């Protein structure tokens, strides 16, 4: 008995031939009359192609509506020319926009695809620039596709300089405002003797156009930046305070004979919070007089952090929280074991510490409620350096030791780690500045003379993904926010009037 094998030659459907059949009305079983406000276009098509290509026609032909059995259908569409081109696309054709302005074609493509129930992707709006007078048309489209990071980019890129921002909702304005904010590092380059700003995404630094001959800042603790007013303030080694507007590049204050100060922060355009001589004080920069002061028992803090308008002061067995605007003690957290590491979340809502018994505690800054208490696993404690909240993620704690970086999820208890490619023996502190970047404060002993060792801080920025790192030639890096677009400043002004 023999077997018979039959081979069939397979072929791919010739879409160009199929399209020509539609153009010539051959074997077509539906006529579409496409109408918009300006023109009417009549085309022939094949129901099976339309049915298989988009949800609109699938529903239309599968229902008992009269259109499902008609051979001619009138459809009111956003743009008949664009709609026709999309149908041509069902036949594998790529049709150019014709005489329609590219921006108009892109917007109407979104409207027509939405009409047909087709997927709308961001790529359809790539490189979109609309005329100022048609900005409201773009707003309607972004409302249709949904407000996300891509939509915010489009709006900010296209918003006219004279646009009335009060026409936008407060919710949208706040989202747009936040979208215009990014992060950078301000630092004084010791080699070049100039203030610079460092792009933390490409590691490129460029000079700030600040007044010439500004002296070297004393230290990180004696430098501060106020994002709201674009003000940089710092003390030099001669007890002089300099306040510079880095947006206008103007020196706004120069005050001599400042007291010995452990830490400073600008709390307004004209007021400076200072820690010195066992007291907190608020200095009026206009009058060079103290507005308020508060005597405290001890300013020899083990750790101290600014969390918004809160100054967190850590001693060996307790943590004090002070309001730096009214100089009031908010609360004290007392612990039974010595504190060996303290951190604050990037949104200034949480503080956390680790004690000598490896107990981890986390509190709400606003209410003082103890949110989490746990014992850190032994594997995290070897050659321990410190803890930090992951930037913009209050559920993840970064635990750093001299060999590894651990990420510990407080909610799930899951942990991940990466082994470092370089030694961290000199690291004494660190902070998380983005999701992947950490800023390490290191310390080394140098000898100017054989018997006079000098302790100096230096800073290293490291990427937690690939562990590439960059040495910063400075002792005062400030991780700050800034506006990437002038629209952000305008929105801030509008929101400030509410």
From Swiss-Prot:
Belongs to the mimivirus BTB/WD family. This is Putative BTB/POZ domain-containing protein L788. It comes from Acanthamoeba polyphaga mimivirus. Residues 28-99 form the BTB domain. Gene3D superfamilies: Potassium Channel Kv1.1, Chain A (3.30.710.10), YVTN repeat-like/Quinoprotein amine dehydrogenase (2.130.10.10). The lineage of its organism: Viruses, Varidnaviria, Bamfordvirae, Nucleocytoviricota, Megaviricetes. It comes from the Viruses. InterPro entries: BTB/POZ_dom, SKP1/BTB/POZ_sf, WD40/YVTN_repeat-like_dom_sf.
């Amino acid at each position: 008995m023999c077997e018979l094998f039959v081979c069939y030659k397979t072929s791919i459907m010739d879409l160009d031939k199929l399209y020509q059949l539609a153009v010539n009305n051959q074997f077509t079983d539906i006529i579409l009359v496409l109408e918009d406000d300006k023109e009417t276009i009549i085309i022939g098509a094949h129901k099976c192609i339309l049915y298989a290509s988009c949800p609109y026609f699938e529903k239309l032909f599968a229902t008992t509506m009269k259109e499902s059995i008609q051979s001619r259908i009138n459809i009111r569409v956003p743009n008949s020319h664009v709609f026709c081109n999309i149908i041509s696309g069902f036949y594998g054709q790529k049709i150019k926009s014709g005489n329609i302005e590219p921006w108009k074609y892109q917007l109407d493509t979104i409207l027509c695809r939405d009409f047909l129930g087709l997927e709308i992707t961001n790529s359809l709006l790539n490189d979109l620039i609309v005329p100022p007078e048609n900005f409201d048309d773009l707003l309607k489209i972004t409302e249709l596709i949904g407000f996300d990071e891509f939509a915010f980019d489009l709006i900010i890129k296209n918003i006219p300089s004279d646009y009335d921002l009060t026409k936008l909702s407060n919710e949208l304005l706040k989202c747009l405002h936040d979208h215009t904010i990014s992060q950078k590092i301000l630092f004084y380059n010791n080699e070049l003797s100039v203030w610079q700003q460092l792009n933390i995404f490409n590691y490129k630094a460029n000079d700030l156009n600040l007044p010439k001959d500004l002296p070297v800042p004393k230290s990180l603790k004696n430098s501060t930046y106020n994002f709201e007013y674009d003000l940089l303030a710092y003390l030099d080694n001669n007890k002089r305070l300099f306040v510079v507007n880095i947006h206008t590049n103007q020196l706004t204050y120069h005050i001599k004979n400042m007291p010995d100060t452990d830490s400073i922060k600008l709390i307004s355009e004209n007021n400076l919070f200072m820690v010195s001589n066992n007291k907190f004080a608020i200095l009026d920069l206009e009058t060079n007089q103290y507005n308020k002061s508060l005597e405290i028992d001890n300013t020899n803090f083990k750790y101290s952090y600014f969390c918004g308008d809160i100054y967190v002061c850590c001693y060996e067995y307790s943590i004090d929280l002070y309001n730096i605007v009214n100089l009031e003690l908010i609360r004290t957290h007392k612990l039974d074991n010595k504190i060996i590491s303290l951190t604050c979340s990037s949104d200034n809502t949480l503080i956390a510490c680790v004690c000598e018994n490896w107990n981890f505690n986390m509190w709400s800054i606003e209410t003082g409620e103890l949110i989490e208490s746990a014992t850190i696993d032994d594997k995290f404690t070897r050659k321990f350096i410190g803890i930090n909240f992951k930037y913009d993620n209050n559920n993840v704690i970064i635990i750093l030791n001299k060999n590894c970086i651990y990420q510990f999820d407080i909610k799930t208890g899951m942990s991940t780690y990466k082994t470092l490619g370089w030694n961290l023996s000199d690291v004494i502190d660190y902070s998380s500045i983005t999701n992947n970047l950490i800023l390490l404060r290191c310390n080394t002993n140098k000898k100017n003379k054989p018997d006079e060792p000098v302790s100096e801080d230096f800073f290293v920025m490291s990427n937690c993904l690939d562990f590439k790192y960059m040495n910063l030639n400075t002792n005062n890096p400030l991780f700050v926010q800034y506006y990437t677009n002038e629209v952000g400043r305008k929105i801030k002004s509008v929101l400030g009037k509410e």
